[in-house]
């Protein structure tokens, strides 16, 4: 069983989350932090698997992404820093308020592992598992990937986000990335 939530951040944005409940006794809670431009629905089958194995799982869309997207893609509140400081912190507050007896763990995919340090209340996690949370710094890449990454960070992302107010999802292979987030990412 799962249910949907709408949580309010300290700066009054709505964060859409989904809670996956186990049918058996709850072993612990897990918060899944998504990758850049990836909707929470991408993790649905994994969250269901974890719930079937006794874990209460929370997935959510960061501000500007998926169900948490807003019309104004140039809103200055849309930053990657806010994903950790406000969005993740809000989800952690909900988790510890509604399920205070549980041990909480976090799975961070890509930037989802990197933003953990930005949430002031991140000390609740008993463990953290990060998947592909490496640096995207262009000079760390090898071969043809190195100039491609350089072009993406210093040309494509800044130009597309300035022209359109976002980087179109088709370019990223995921959701559109609002301008402020895209420029911070680059």
Q: Which functions belong to the PLM regions below?
A:
Residues 77-98:
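Alpha/beta-hydrolase active-site loop
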Residues 40-72:
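Conserved alpha/beta-hydrolase
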